């Protein structure tokens, strides 16, 4: 559906996760130099967002302004091309903090690491793990308080659980990390 001015409109409320996923898509496909520009691009997609919410989303996503040697600064999420001369560690640091706050315990089976969180936190954590793009992770599946994280070969679920749990100091099923 489109509005009278040609912009897309959304008939259902957009969740924070969906909105943040769209922000990541936009930042990955083009250089966005300001929050005003990003809010206009989101509006083109049918998402009307306040500056405060957009700023909070960018912070939660670990977005940083990157200034290439020649050119205007732009928002980026994740590692930045080495020609820009800057490595963004923000998202991985944010993941460590999130794991510190949300990870209750870890377990594993085969190539799956199972992360336990407080009720209601699993989808938020899984979404962030996916956005960070750890090379050790193929993907995640989340319930209410449990996240299954699929380890990329040759890692095992135990290795991945120890890696993620070690970042947070979480305990395994028998009190071990």
Swiss-Prot record:
One of its GO terms (molecular function) is arginine binding. It comes from the Bacteria. Its main location: cytoplasm. It comes from Corynebacterium efficiens (strain DSM 44549 / YS-314 / AJ 12310 / JCM 11189 / NBRC 100395). It is found in: Cytoplasm. GO terms for cellular component: cytoplasm. Belongs to the ArgR family. Keywords: Amino-acid biosynthesis, Arginine biosynthesis, Cytoplasm, DNA-binding, Repressor, Transcription, Transcription regulation. HAMAP family: Arg_repressor. GO terms for biological process: L-arginine biosynthetic process; protein complex oligomerization; regulation of arginine biosynthetic process. The keyword Cytoplasm applies. Pathway: Amino-acid biosynthesis; L-arginine biosynthesis [regulation]. PANTHER family: ARGININE REPRESSOR (PTHR34471:SF1). This is Arginine repressor. The lineage of its organism: Bacteria, Bacillati, Actinomycetota, Actinomycetes, Mycobacteriales. The keyword Mitochondrion does not apply. Regulates arginine biosynthesis genes. InterPro entries: Arg_repress, Arg_repress_C, Arg_repress_C_sf, Arg_repress_DNA-bd, WH-like_DNA-bd_sf, WH_DNA-bd_sf.
């Amino acid at each position: 559906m489109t509005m009278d001015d040609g912009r897309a409109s959304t008939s259902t409320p957009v969740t924070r996760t969906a909105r943040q996923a769209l922000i990541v898509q936009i930042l990955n496909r083009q250089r966005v130099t300001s929050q005003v520009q990003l809010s206009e691009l989101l509006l083109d997609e049918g998402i009307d967002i306040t500056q405060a919410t957009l700023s909070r989303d960018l912070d939660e996503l670990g977005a940083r302004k990157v200034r290439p040697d020649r050119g205007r600064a732009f928002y980026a999420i994740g590692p930045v091309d080495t020609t820009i001369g800057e490595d963004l560690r923000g998202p991985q640091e944010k993941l460590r903090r999130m794991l510190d706050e949300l990870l209750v315990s870890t377990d594993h089976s085969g190539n799956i690491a199972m992360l336990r969180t407080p009720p209601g936190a699993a989808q938020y954590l899984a979404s962030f793990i996916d956005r960070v793009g750890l090379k050790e992770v193929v993907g995640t599946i989340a319930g209410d308080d449990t996240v299954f994280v699929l380890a990329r070969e040759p890692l095992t679920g135990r290795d991945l659980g120890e890696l993620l749990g070690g970042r947070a100091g979480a305990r395994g099923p028998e009190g071990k990390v």
